A protein has these predicted regions:
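Extracytoplasmic catalytic/substrate-binding loops of multi-pass membrane glycan-assembly enzymes
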Residues: 41-60, 68-83, 90-91
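Transmembrane-helix motifs of polytopic, lipid-linked glycan transferases
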Residues: 102-121
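Membrane-interface alpha helices of multi-pass inner-membrane proteins
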Residues: 176-193, 204, 231-236
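Start-transfer (signal-anchor) and selected internal transmembrane alpha helices
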Residues: 1-38, 220-231
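Aromatic- and kink-enriched transmembrane "portal" helix at the membrane-lumen/periplasm boundary
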Residues: 129-155, 186, 190
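Juxtamembrane membrane-water interface segments immediately following transmembrane helices
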Residues: 197, 218-253
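Short hydrophobic alpha-helices at membrane interfaces in multi-pass membrane enzymes
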Residues: 123-130, 164-186
Length: 253
């Protein structure tokens, strides 16, 4: 009887895994849905910029000063420097608008991909219902592109990705999965630091939740990886602030 019980428990994981959608199929579906959203928005709406974004774009593109300029307002210097360089190299491309659109649609793709990877096939009807409602709520941000909402979307996606990383035992695998969260948080911090800081408490809740799920976290590589994630996240924020302060350290500013 004990043997039969053991065999039954041991075979649960393969059955569950068999019900999962493959990563390739999840990637194909998420990209396909995002493409359909882009097509729908482009055919029915004309993307707009918020008032602050118009000013930021005009500074970055050189409309105000005659040459692309990285010293603008609110956004940190690391990000504005990259965008201003792109305007210098290819002035006929709307880089700022393209960047905000890439943030919105890129984060949508990542969230859809993660949803499809973590749910089994028999729950897809419920997931599609959630996705439909999600898209309706997100639609205004696809139409009117704003830097504040884009920073919030980046932070939310970073935390969502961090929360849904599987609790693997291998530290290198965990770090590879966390790299994307670092990148998203880094861009959010440089796009609008205040919004990124508002999202940090949610990351802390996820951090504590992950630790509470692991009974042996005090002596495991899992704890070290989680602490490394927190430390690197703080380094991202401090480094972005330090570079921005140095860029505006001249008496002229």
């Amino acid at each position: 009887m004990r043997y039969l019980t053991f065999e039954k428990i041991r075979t649960i994981d393969p059955i569950i895994d068999a019900q999962k959608i493959s990563r390739k199929k999840a990637a194909f579906l998420s990209v396909g849905i995002t493409f359909l959203v882009i097509l729908f928005v482009s055919l029915n709406y004309e993307p707009l910029l918020g008032p602050d974004d118009v000013g930021i774009r005009n500074i970055l593109s050189g409309i105000y000063t005659g040459t692309p300029e990285a010293h603008t307002y609110f956004m940190y210097y690391i990000l504005t420097k990259v965008i201003s360089i792109l305007y210098k190299w290819f002035p006929n491309i709307y880089w700022y608008v393209l960047f905000l659109a890439l943030v919105n649609y890129g984060c949508l793709t990542l969230i859809l991909y993660r949803f499809l990877c973590i749910v089994d096939r028999y729950k897809l009807i419920g997931i599609w219902s959630v996705v439909a409602g999600f898209l309706i709520l997100w639609l205004p941000f696809f139409i009117t592109l704003e830097w504040t909402s884009a920073a919030g979307i980046l932070s939310a996606t970073a935390i969502f990705w961090y929360a849904t990383v599987p609790d693997r035992k291998d530290r290198n695998e965990l770090l590879r999965d966390y790299i994307l969260s670092f990148i998203l948080l880094f861009i959010s911090c440089n796009l609008r630091n205040d919004v990124a800081l508002l999202a940090i408490p949610f990351a802390g809740v996820v951090f504590l939740w992950k630790l509470s799920r692991n009974k042996s976290f005090f002596s495991s590589a899992f704890l070290h990886t989680q602490l490394l994630f927190v430390i690197l996240s703080m380094v991202i924020i401090v480094m972005s602030r330090a570079v921005d302060s140095f860029a505006y350290s001249s008496d002229v500013w």
